[in-house]
């Protein structure tokens, strides 16, 4: 790095990408709607409790099997903890979704939340 530039400080987050499973096609519409409602209640509760920073659907993902259909942003400091939380999601437990968890970094101060999680 040249002396002309300040070093960049990075903030670390965990990103959970939710994928619809191949098994999802085995579920009838009523079951999918029930599981989705349970999933939505679970993720809303995690955001409201501060365990998860944000969650929501992903639009315009390629319409292929196991496409990404949602994402969650965490700042737990542990991929294992995020995997534990994500795998407890009713949609994951019941086989409608699977989740990929990874670390994501961005320059510090770029992301702010209007309702910060409780400390």
Please place each PLM-identified region on the residue numbering.
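Conserved, structured core segments of small domains
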Residues: 1-119
